[in-house]
């Protein structure tokens, strides 16, 4: 009888070892929050291989993996119904997640999204050649840059989605250019690959008395607009990804009133009139 009970106990123990990842629940695991509004279950105990089991559910797909650490970091993988493969990489400090979708071969990327703890993210989609065809960069404040129809030379269409309005333009290998037009005036906001912003204004008005010119101050991120040698207004492109406008007095010598945040595209156009 004792041998029988010992045999049953051994079988149950082996079954428990084989279950590993598939048997995680709230009793034998800890849930860890991750960037991107995800969470991962981490086993409280090590498995038979001396590692901690991990389970995460992404878009209703269960991903499984193991890790030497019990803090939730590691690599998890799964396979979709269409046989495409999904890989979730969680950084050691839990500050970043990388979600990748591959074709059936497990090598050709379909999409990739990197999300940080501050809620900023970069999402990319790839064409049949494995080249980036679409890209969305979301900042921590929720504003974002959207790129579509990206070609092999790095060119494409661009949008900057700000609070209340959208700027549209183009992408090149060197920079993003977002344009606002009003009458004869064209305002161009340039964003370099490193994220540095510069703004310029071009006016095709042939009359010197009404033609607008502008000077950009990179130190204060301010575009000062001048008409007939008099300053008329300042447009400030803030680090918080907002734009403010403030008027100069009639002599064009000093600012008056307070800077007002622009919340509509028409307000930018009015500032260019």
Curated annotation (Swiss-Prot):
GO terms for cellular component: cell outer membrane; cell surface. Keywords: Cell outer membrane, Lipoprotein, Membrane, Palmitate, Plasmid, Signal. Pfam families: Lipoprotein_1. A lipid is attached at residue 17 (S-diacylglycerol cysteine). It is a lipid-anchor. The keyword Electron transport does not apply. InterPro entries: OM_lipoprot_Borrelia (IPR001809), OM_lipoprot_dom_sf (IPR023322). It is found in: Cell outer membrane; Cell surface. Residues 1-16 form the signal peptide. A lipid is attached at residue 17 (N-palmitoyl cysteine). SUPFAM superfamilies: Outer surface protein. It comes from the Bacteria. Belongs to the OspA lipoprotein family. This is Outer surface protein A. It comes from Borreliella burgdorferi (strain N40) (Borrelia burgdorferi). The gene is ospA.
């Amino acid at each position: 009888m004792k041998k029988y009970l010992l045999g049953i106990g051994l079988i149950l123990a082996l079954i428990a070892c084989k279950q590993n990842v598939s048997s995680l629940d709230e009793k034998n695991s800890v849930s860890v929050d991750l960037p991107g509004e995800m969470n991962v279950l981490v086993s409280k105990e090590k498995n038979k291989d001396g590692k901690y089991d991990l389970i995460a559910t992404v878009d209703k797909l269960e991903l499984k993996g193991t890790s030497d650490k019990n803090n939730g970091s590691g690599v998890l993988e799964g396979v979709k119904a269409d046989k495409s493969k999904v890989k979730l990489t969680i950084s050691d400090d839990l500050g970043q997640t990388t979600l990748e979708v591959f074709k059936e071969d497990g090598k050709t990327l379909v999409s990739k999204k990197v999300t940080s703890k501050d809620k900023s993210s970069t999402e990319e989609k790839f064409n049949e050649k494995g080249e980036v065809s679409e890209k969305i960069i979301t900042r921590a404040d929720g504003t974002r840059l959207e790129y579509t129809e990206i070609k092999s030379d790095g060119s494409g269409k661009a949008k900057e989605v700000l609070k209340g309005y959208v700027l549209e333009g183009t992408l090149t290998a060197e920079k993003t250019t977002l344009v606002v037009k009003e009458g004869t005036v064209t305002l161009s906001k340039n964003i370099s690959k490193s994220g540095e912003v510069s703004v310029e204004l071009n006016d095709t008005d042939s009359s010197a008395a009404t033609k607008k010119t502008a000077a950009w101050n990179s130190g204060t991120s301010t575009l000062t607009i001048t008409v007939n040698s008099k300053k008329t207004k300042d447009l400030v492109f803030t680090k918080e990804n907002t734009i403010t406008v403030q008027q100069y007095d009639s002599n064009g010598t000093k600012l008056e009133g307070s800077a007002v945040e622009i919340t509509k595209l028409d307000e930018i156009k009015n500032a260019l009139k």
